[in-house]
Amino acid sequence: MPASPIRKLVPLAEAARARGTKIYHLNIGQPDLPSPQTGLDALKKIDRTGLEYSPSDGYRSLREKLVGYYEQFQIKLSPDDIIVTTGGSEAVLFAFMSCLNPGDEIIVPEPAYANYMAFAISAGAVIRPVVSSIEQGFALPDVAEFEKLINDRTRGILICNPNNPTGYLYTRKEMNRIRDLVKKYDLFLFSDEVYREFIYTGSPYISACHLEGIEQNVVLIDSVSKRYSECGIRIGALITKNRTLRNAVMKFCQARLSPPLIGQIVAEASIDAPRSYSTEVYEEYIERRKCLIDGLNRLPGVYSPIPMGAFYTVARLPVEDSDDFCAWCLSDFDYEGETVMLAPASGFYSDPACGRNEVRIAYVLKKEDLERALVVLGKALEAYNNRK
């Protein structure tokens, strides 16, 4: 089981904090913005004498509320197409466990969310990467690169759209090419779409559920964590119109009994948040994105493409080993009592050499803190490269 590139440096961060160093956390996608007041109010108003199990697929009232939410994005579902999970992570794990046998393979564009590898290992499956490049803005590689990897053990393709860690947004043309491949070889399409509300270019959001002819192949992964700043309530969803697959997933759901009761109450109420909440959050991330990307590309030797969605970027640094640099920032560096914590990009590739001089940066800090973090990062790079 690989260590998380997002969390593996935590012991060094704790030691730095114990020394009195202030850390700017650019390493993890933990939104710092308030959760919807509707959700917080629902939490405060819980008046129960017991906290019982919920149904294994989640409360129907929440699933009905989610149907209405997805309708805003032209995704037509019924409550029975939705299974509430303990975060989006459990949705990915249950999807893999239900669709893949040991030794089966899934094709994944990389860099990719690091925990996909851990979930594949848990299912006994093998990830076959198709590597995108920072020079091309992490655009989807040519479909021919996918087709080269397909064999009799290939069971699916996994995408994240908008992408974590790169912020790339798939075009309609790219999604149609994936659809054609899924249809041709009768593969599952696992589509992680938790960042759909964070698209900054005016480009359309193309869901896997919008693709005609593969309705039985699509497994949509979702979560309330990012759009409502509710990572801690651990509520996600696995969505499929494939009844055979749903029945298989439900066996895993029944084995873990139920998704979190209190989390479901908060999530259901959060869906009722006024549109102004989403608008304010969206506008804040637009400002942060501009601040971060402009600032990164002004630093000597640093390059970041402009992310189209989510709230991450993968940047190339003027270092040979970003793992070493990120650890050094916490163990051996501070500038005026401050340092930065980054996620080495090597952990987002199957072959760590692919991201050796790259880092993932999350812009989940207020603009003033991002500006200061960029100053500290610049000083860190200068000091690191001037070591004797």
Regions found by a protein language model. Name each.
Residues P2, L9, A16-Y24, I28-K45, ...:
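PLP-dependent class I/II
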Residues E14, V67, E71, F96-M97:
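Generic structural signal for well-ordered alpha-helical scaffold segments
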Residues R48:
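P-loop/Walker A NTP-binding region and its immediately flanking N-terminal helices
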Residues Y53-T86:
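Conserved N-terminal alpha-helix of the aminotransferase class I/II PLP-enzyme fold
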